[in-house]
């Protein structure tokens, strides 16, 4: 009996070890802000560098410091000019600067009464349409996802929520309070995170909730090993990036990357 059990466990372990990560050897585009920006070097690797090493993938990184949702299509245009559609997936990691800038949350939809054929009878029904408005947070997200899903209908698109925010000072006129404070339009960071979760459902794009799952909580000094410290408790350091990358790596195990594959390995 013990031999049979040992054999079963061995077979299970061999099966698990034989499963290849679905994102292995992939070509991944990264849009985002300073945490993604390849021009802002951390004392080590960025999260996408870790993922590139672990997955043997090719990263195409277009994130720029300070960017908000309304600037993502500009990053997409640069990508298109450089690599066209020669990639497998897009990750979008942005939103924290929209919160810091006090961008209003806004609405997802507008509604209007229209006449429509229902079972052969013309009736009046209320119809909703996405708000496409760069002056609001949800409007910005709608614009980006509407465009990307139309332009790249066969590509995987993954949203990453912003992580928690602690105090940062990058100059006398660039002081950013921690997330326990409302922003200029009276919203907490939570509202911006929740909107990205909602966008996942509205636009049928998966979301990796780093705000909840990464474990990073720089408001506690005990987690100082994950941030540069001093005047910057906002950006993760190399160890913070590694922890984010670990979370993303394991979440990606549940998501397909190449959507043109006919049968999983």
Whereabouts are the PLM-identified features?
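Residue-level detector of intrinsically disordered/flexible regions characterized by low predicted structural confidence
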Residues: 4, 264-265
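A periodicity- and composition-biased signal for non-globular, repetitive helical segments
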Residues: 8-9, 146
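Alpha-helical transmembrane segments and their juxtamembrane interfaces
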Residues: 12-13, 43, 166, 247
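Serine-esterase "nucleophile elbow" of acetyl-processing enzymes
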Residues: 17-65, 70, 76-86, 90, ...
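Alpha-helical cap/lid subdomain in secreted, periplasmic
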Residues: 54, 75-264
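Sec-dependent signal peptide recognition
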Residues: 2-8
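Residues that line or immediately flank small-molecule/substrate-binding pockets and catalytic motifs
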Residues: 8, 32, 94
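Hydrophobic h-region of N-terminal signal peptides that target proteins for export
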Residues: 9-17
């Amino acid at each position: 009996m013990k031999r049979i059990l040992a054999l079963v466990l061995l077979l299970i372990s061999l099966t698990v070890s034989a499963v290849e990560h679905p994102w292995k050897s992939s070509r991944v585009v990264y849009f985002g802000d300073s945490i993604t920006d390849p021009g802002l070097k951390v004392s080590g690797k960025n999260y996408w560098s870790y993922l590139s090493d672990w997955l043997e993938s090719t990263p195409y990184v277009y994130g720029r410091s300070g960017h908000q949702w309304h600037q993502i299509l500009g990053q997409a245009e640069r990508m298109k000019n450089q690599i066209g559609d020669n990639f497998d997936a897009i990750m979008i990691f942005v939103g924290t600067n929209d919160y810091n800038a006090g961008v209003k949350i806004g609405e997802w939809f507008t509604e209007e009464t229209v006449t429509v054929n229902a079972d052969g009878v013309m009736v009046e029904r209320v119809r909703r349409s996405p708000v496409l408005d760069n002056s609001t947070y949800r409007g910005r997200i709608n614009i980006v996802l509407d465009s990307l899903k139309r332009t790249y209908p066969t590509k995987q698109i993954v949203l990453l929520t912003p992580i928690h925010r602690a105090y940062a000072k990058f100059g006398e006129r660039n002081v950013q309070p921690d997330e326990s404070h409302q922003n200029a339009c009276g919203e907490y960071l939570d509202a911006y995170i929740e909107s990205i979760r909602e966008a996942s459902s509205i636009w049928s794009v998966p979301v990796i909730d780093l705000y909840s799952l990464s474990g990073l909580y720089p408001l506690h000094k005990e987690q100082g090993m994950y941030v540069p410290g001093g005047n910057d408790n906002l950006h993760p350091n190399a160890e913070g990036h590694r922890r984010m990358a670990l979370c993303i790596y394991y979440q990606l195990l549940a998501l397909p990357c190449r959507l043109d594959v006919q049968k999983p390995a």
